[in-house]
Amino acid sequence: MNAMRLTSSAPSLRQHTITAPAPAWRHPDHIVLETCVEDIEGVRISARAGADRAELCDNLTAAGTTPSIGTIEAAIFAAAEQVEQRRAQAGPYWADKADAAAPFGLRVIIRPRGGSFVYDADEGRAMIADVRRIASLALEMAEFTRPQATGGGRGQLPPAVDLGFVVGALTEDGTIDRGLVRLLVDMANGAPVTFHRAFDQCRDTVEAYGDLEGLGVRYVLTSGAAQTAADGASVIAGLVASGGPTVVAAGAVRPHGLVDLVESTGVREVHMRCPRECMTPDEPKRTDEALVRRAVEAVRTVPLPE
């Protein structure tokens, strides 16, 4: 699809509490854990159990589609409540404590349907409209999620929720749809944007990675174009070494394999599903809090790569 001829003023997120956090809170001293969830309770569990971020999707049976505005709003509240509880437990000077100060990252997938990642003009416009509406929602909710603690009165307090977007779009020939991705990043207007595993379907991942850096994408979710992150470790390692957007390893990532994955790739961020076992095929795949806690414990103990 060619670059779309669409202009619109996106609401600014930069001066509100639901934004990308200031650099002081952006780089934890541990491997970052991002969960993948498809409901509000999954966001709440992830924040309560100590995960750093959650990707919020609908319809994970189709690899994730855009959740409703109502679901996103409720998820922001759920995450903010957990962060405020953590900060309240840390006391009035919580802003001086890294674990308490860190916002919870909520990444909303923007994907109008399952299937291929090649979109026509109508689908592209729908994706841009979704980013615009969610950005507007963030502004509306900013006052409701403003930090309550004083943090000692020094400097700007971190937000409770670091809201961002997960996008992905390809052309028919397996390259990044630069026109559409640029419009989506522009509409996010400063909020962090992740390019999802459509990346693994690119004909040339090195070229695609360079394109995404030029488009302002901050994170790339990838298995190294393999079935699992472990199988794609060499590709992931090459991307990490090139120093572009932050690489988030995904694809059958499990707590017991984190040490080997980090050592073989150099990644500092991982993405994993933590589903509860289902009794029937039709039962929704809820998030398993015990599994999230095991994953959190694992990422806190794995040494950071040099």
Segments from the language model and where they lie:
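N-terminal amphipathic alpha-helix/helix-capping segment at the start of soluble metabolic enzymes
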Residues: N2-C36, Y93-D99
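C-terminal alpha-helical cap/extension of soluble enzyme domains
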Residues: L13, R111-G115, E143-F144, G153-L157, ...
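Glycine-enriched alpha-helix->loop->beta-strand junction motifs that scaffold or abut catalytic
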Residues: A47-A54, A79, A102, P159-D162, ...
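Surface-exposed amphipathic alpha-helices with a cationic face
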Residues: A22-W25, E73-E84, A95-A100, A135, ...
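Catalytic cores of alpha/beta
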Residues: E38-I45, S116-S136, R203-L215, L239-G243, ...
